[in-house]
A protein has these predicted regions:
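Hydrophobic/aromatic beta-strand elements that line small-molecule binding cavities or substrate pockets
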Residues: 11-12, 56-62, 72-74, 82-96
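Hydrophobic pocket/interface hotspot
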Residues: 21-26, 32, 47, 60, ...
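Beta-strand elements of well-folded, non-transmembrane domains
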Residues: 15-17, 89-91, 109-113
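A conserved amphipathic terminal alpha-helix motif
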Residues: 108-146
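Short beta-strand segments that buttress and anchor functional surface loops
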Residues: 45-51, 69-76
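Intrinsic-disorder/low-complexity, polar/charged segments enriched in Ser/Thr/Lys/Arg/Asp/Glu/Gln
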Residues: 6-14, 55, 69, 82, ...
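Hydrophobic ligand-binding cavity/cleft-lining segments
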Residues: 1-42
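Hydrophobic-ligand-binding modules of eukaryotic lipid transfer/binding families
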Residues: 1-13, 94-98, 126, 141-146
Length: 146
């Protein structure tokens, strides 16, 4: 499958906390799914958003806590899906000569061609936005959070 045949969805949030603090909240596939309003069963994940619902049949799932990454492959109907969530330590800000640690939380999905790719993309985009905003509200301790 070429890049031209894929629908790419990316979103990220930068929070004022350490990666270790973020990992306490995002410690595995089940807690991660819950933040994004997704419900996991043995081999499926139901993704719920303001745009509707869809069911991802997981064919592969890899949780790498030491690399702060979750990778999932599967299908939504006839649409091939590859997705991942990663956490990366960053410098959030430097003030008064002090480095303030931060964490970038990045979500990414690649959707192949299918009969309902646009609908699935809308659902996933809304779920990503919802999840990242709730994670930001929970983790971000910067003074401008409100």
């Amino acid at each position: 499958m070429t890049a031209a045949e894929l629908t790419l969805i990316d979103d990220q949030v930068l929070v004022a906390c350490t990666v270790d603090e973020a990992m306490q909240l995002l410690d595995g596939p089940d807690p991660i799914a819950a933040w994004f309003r997704a419900t996991r069963n043995e081999t499926t994940t139901t993704i719920t958003s303001a745009e509707g619902d869809c069911v991802l049949e997981r064919t592969s799932e890899r949780w790498h806590p030491t690399d702060q990454a979750l990778t999932i492959d599967g299908r939504i109907g006839d649409i091939h899906v590859h997705a991942h969530l990663t956490l990366m330590a960053v410098v959030h800000s430097i003030s008064d000569g002090h480095v303030n640690h931060g964490t970038e939380i990045w979500v990414h999905a690649e959707l192949g061609r299918g009969s309902h790719t646009r609908r699935a993309a809308r659902i996933i985009t809304a779920a990503f936005a919802h999840g990242l905003e709730h994670i930001r509200l929970e983790l971000d301790r910067s003074p401008n959070v409100g």
